[in-house]
Every structure is written in C-alpha cells, then in structure tokens.
Regions:
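Single conserved hydrophobic/aromatic residue that forms the stacking wall/gate
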Residues: 407-418
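Low-complexity, highly charged intrinsically disordered N-terminal segments
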Residues: 79-81
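Active-site bordering "gate/hinge" segments
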Residues: 84
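Conserved, structured C-terminal
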Residues: 2-69, 129-409
C-alpha cells in the first residue's frame, strides 16, 4: 500500500438531497429503519453485507462506549443481513452449505455457523435461526451468501428470499432488565443463551434472540416489514435511556469482541484461511455426511495459528506488524484499546503454529513505534462465558490493568506494577 494511504480511513457519510437530482447511491444500499436515531451524532458508515454499519458517532468517545457496554446498556443498529431459506429441501441445502449438523438446531434456538468454499476457505459467518420446521433465517456478516445459496441449490425444492429484516442489538448488564420491562411475556429470566422467541412489545409481535457481538449480557431484535420499527425503536431508546442507554457504533463492540475472541469476517478470517487455522475447528463436524469443503478440511492442517495479543501501552497497526527476533512472524487482523485491561488488544494470525500464548513479541503500533506485546489465549478472560450467560453478574467499577509478566522494563514496571 502506498504510504500516503496508510493512515487514511474511508467512510460513507449521509447526505441530504438538494436540488432536483436524487443521490442514487443513497438508495442502492439498504438502510436500517432506525438510522434516523444516529443522524444527530454526525455518523460515519462502512459498507457491510450490502447494508451500512455504523463506524463512528460523536455522542461518546470509544472508551465511553466501551464502558457503557460493560457497565450499563447500549443500543446498536447493525449491518447484519438475514436471508430466509425455506421449503421442503431447506434443511438439505443448509446441510450442504454449513459444516455443522443443522438437523440439531431446533425451533426456538440459534446456532453459530460459517460456510466454506470447496478448498476450505471461509466465506462468512453468522447466526442461524430455525423459524419453523422448513424455514430458517441466516443473519450473516459481511460476504455474499445469497449467490452461494443459489449456486448450490440446483435440484432442490427450496426458496431463498430477502425477508427485509433488520437487526439491532441491546447489550450490557442492564439489557435483560430492559427486555423484561418492554415485553408482555416473562421469558427473559427463563431464556438460555442462543434461544430466540416471538414476544409482544407495545402490542406488536417481534422476534428477539439472546445473542450479540460483545460477549456481554444482551439480546437482538429483528424488525420485520410488518413491524412499526420507528415506534418500537423509539420505545427501546426512550426506556433504555432511563437506565443510561446510549446509541453506539463499532468501537463499543470492537474491544469486547476482541477480548472475547469473536472473529470478524473479512478481517480475522478470509477465503484464504480455513476454520482450523483461526481456531474455529470445534465448529466443523467431519463425521457429518458430505458438505462443501469437507474433503479439503479433512486433509487440512488442524493446528491453530490465531491468538489474542496484548500490547504494552499501544494499539497495534493492522497488517504485517509482528516480529520475533527481528523476523516478521505474522499479521495483526484486528486491534484496538481496552479501557478495562488498560492495554492494546488484538487478534494475531501467525505464520506458524509453533509460536503461541506466552510468547513476547515486538509489534509496530499506531504511534509509529515498536511496543512489546504478549500472545495470549482467547477469550482473554471469562473463558467459560459466564458473563454472556448471566451467571457472572459482577459489574466492574474500574479498570483491572493487565501486566505483562514476561516484560520487565523499568517503564513497564513503573506504569503497570505501581
């Protein structure tokens, strides 16, 4: 990449139409019906799964958004893109597409899924909801799954449709309290992680799921065309605001999902990485009958080369910026700052599986300096997922700084050891 582009960020900005010439781009992208809630905060967007995802809002700093997610409650309108797969052969198609056994997904449950090309490279991932006996939604991350369904459905009695459903996430320790307040049914306390249900909110039937992209307690709401999204969205925001809710953008999710080891499609995995390489091998069922990519995955190297990384007093540059003994050994695929751990956090994809957690490396950071960093397991904390399941209800009131025990410079000692 040319050096003049290295520190340039490209974004999509909302533009008010003026004059008699319409802005065609504004209508070539599907807009979340609650985008108007973001407009007062000078939003910037990126293109994501044929939709927009909010990258920046002016109402709170990235650190403030992070702490709202970890201590209180946030609302985020996502770019997730659900497609509907229905018909007598819907299950057969999905069994071809995904490497997990879809027959195990019962109505009322969700399942994390990803699809692979024939060579084992990952297309994208997302959340599969079994809506009915022969009807599924797959709320996908960035990537083209619609064409993949079409290309692999020959000879099957199946419909692949765009249901025009939009997804918002409500995340944080107070999220289930808000849901209990908003819906008529008293199901929130009975729900398990990855359950979904149709509930009544302000007289409307809506689908909500016990899922999210923060690994904090939370839920998602799926706005269907028949829903009054504006009324429901304003209700959620107004009632949530009484609990401290704010609307957030990507920064609120990035830190928590990196700490939790939740991978981002197109960044932490691509069509050039197979599931085993990035630590997703547990979601591949090689005992299952044939699925796309099975042969390649059977023959693939099963070792993991993707790890977390904590950086001393810096934010790692994305790209080929990790060195060990003055030799490049891998890439930073995601990075940000963790206000809770008081260090840079990231996801690293290494060139070899022989290097792993506990290794101290050098990383080029956004301040153009080299910082010490340590590879670690993912998730970085809460390995049993007790926070997202509502088992661990402890809400941190302050930062709990990470200390690189293997790096003992005077500067690190003074700042991190006190």
């Amino acid at each position: 990449m040319h050096k003049s582009l290295q520190n340039i960020r490209f974004s999509i900005k909302p533009q008010k139409e003026e004059g008699d010439r319409p802005v065609e781009l504004a209508r070539s992208i599907s807009i979340h019906p609650l985008t108007y809630q973001e407009l007062p905060y000078d939003p910037e967007y990126s293109h994501y799964a044929g939709r927009l995802t909010t990258e920046k809002l002016s109402n709170a700093s990235p650190d403030e958004q992070y702490w709202k997610t970890k201590q209180e409650i946030i609302l985020r309108h996502t770019g997730e893109h659900p497609y509907e797969i229905s018909g007598p052969d819907a299950l057969e198609l999905l069994q071809r597409i995904f490497p997990r056994d879809i027959s195990k997904v019962k109505k009322g449950r969700c399942s994390y899924q990803f699809a692979c090309y024939h060579d084992g490279g990952i297309i994208t991932d997302g959340l599969l909801l079994r809506i009915d006996e022969n009807c599924y939604w797959f709320a996908q991350a960035d990537g083209d799954m619609f064409s993949w369904y079409k290309a692999n459905s020959e000879g099957l009695d199946v419909n692949i449709n765009e249901p025009n459903v939009f997804v918002s996430q409500i995340q944080g320790p107070k999220s289930m309290e808000l849901l209990d307040h908003l819906i008529d049914e008293k199901v929130a306390k009975e729900w398990n992680y990855f359950d979904w249900a149709e509930v009544t909110m302000a007289g409307e039937k809506v689908i909500v799921s016990r899922t999210g992209f923060t690994n904090e307690l939370g839920w998602e709401i799926y706005f269907r065309p028949e829903n009054n999204a504006e009324m429901l969205g304003d209700l959620i925001l107004n009632e949530g605001s009484k609990m401290g809710m704010i609307i957030t953008a990507t920064p609120s999710f990035r830190g928590r999902r990196i700490e939790a080891g939740l991978l981002s499609a197109g960044q932490d995995f691509t069509n050039e990485t197979n599931p085993f390489t990035v630590g997703l091998g547990r979601f591949v069922d090689l005992e299952k009958e044939n699925f796309i990519g099975k042969k390649a995955l059977e023959n693939a190297d099963k070792s993991c080369r993707s790890w977390g990384i904590r950086i001393v007093d810096g934010i790692a540059k994305k790209g080929r910026s990790i060195k060990l003994n003055d030799q490049f050994i891998g890439n930073i695929t995601s990075s940000t700052w963790s206000p809770y751990q008081v260090c840079g956090v990231g996801i690293a994809l290494l060139d070899t599986s022989e290097i792993g957690p506990g290794t101290v490396v050098d990383v080029e950071c956004t301040d153009e300096k080299i910082h010490k960093a340590e590879l670690c397991k993912l998730p970085m904390y809460d390995p049993e997922g007790e926070i997202v399941r509502g088992i661990n209800k402890r809400i941190p009131t302050k930062a709990e700084p990470w200390v690189c025990l293997l790096y003992t410079s005077d500067a690190a000692d003074e700042k991190y050891r006190g």
